[in-house]
Amino acid sequence: MTAASTTATTVLQATQSDVLQEIQSNFLLNSSIWVNIALAGVVILLFVAMGRDLESPRAKLIWVATMLVPLVSISSYAGLASGLTVGFLQMPPGHALAGQEVLSPWGRYLTWTFSTPMILLALGLLADTDIASLFTAITMDIGMCVTGLAAALITSSHLLRWVFYGISCAFFVAVLYVLLVQWPADAEAAGTSEIFGTLKILTVVLWLGYPILWALGSEGVALLSVGVTSWGYSGLDILAKYVFAFLLLRWVAANEGTVSGSGMGIGSGGATPADD
């Protein structure tokens, strides 16, 4: 190992130690992380039990998609708790905390990048939508999360932080269009409109809270502390992920016959073969 790499490793370890100490000394921040880890563990066990008797391919796919939500969350929140995906950022000129080092739990964006597509996959399967529409929703969602991460990490320009925030919101609008305009008709045709409508409203209302928290928190205008913002995100995660997934799985387990027949390639296991 070269001297340069040894120095870099030492600095990284020191930084992680400082970050971990800061997390543990901030009760609101620390508790918001560990409560989510504990809940994710319980939810994983619950979802395993709820999905063990599912038989149809489409129902199983919905179950796998919803299972991945707490699995991703517990992994990501463990990264936050260890300080691995948290860092100090010096805010640029023009920011409310310009020149100050602010603790940034940027690992949350990893959680959202991998978990929110699973939420959309589950909703798309429930609505029995077509693959093109599902692909659109998921890719727009990933774009939203990645540009949100860029907005949070940029320290060179206050303006660019808000530019990327605006781009992220534009991706979000595309996701909302799919959820509110395209998929309801698909769900109506699939016979799942009632539960889809409930989950759609739950998802849209809660997801709107994320950009609002970003704007009000230390990443935006800094009206909220890091700990308060973290609890806001954790609360939204609990409702938008675990409660959402529980409601969906409970309905699927009780109405598997409704989702057993599907016209979508993914949900039905492929197109109907042609007659010989």
From Swiss-Prot:
One GO biological process term: phototransduction
Membrane topology: Multi-pass membrane protein
Sequence positions bearing Pyrrolidone carboxylic acid: 21
Gene3D superfamilies, alphabetized: Rhodopsin 7-helix transmembrane proteins
SMART domains attached to this UniProt entry: Bac_rhodopsin
Prosegment location in residue numbers: 1-20
GO CC, alphabetical: membrane
Domain of life: Archaea
Residues that span the membrane, as ranges: 31-51, 61-81, 109-129, 134-154, 162-182, 195-215, 220-240
GO molecular function, one term: monoatomic ion channel activity
Location within or outside the cell: Membrane
Residues recorded as bearing N6-(retinylidene)lysine in the entry: 241
Primary localization: membrane
Posttranslational mods: The covalent binding of retinal to the apoprotein, bacterioopsin, generates bacteriorhodopsin.
Free-text function comment from the UniProt entry: Light-driven chloride pump.
Family: Belongs to the archaeal/bacterial/fungal opsin family.
Protein name according to UniProt: Halorhodopsin
Organism: Haloarcula marismortui (strain ATCC 43049 / DSM 3752 / JCM 8966 / VKM B-1809)
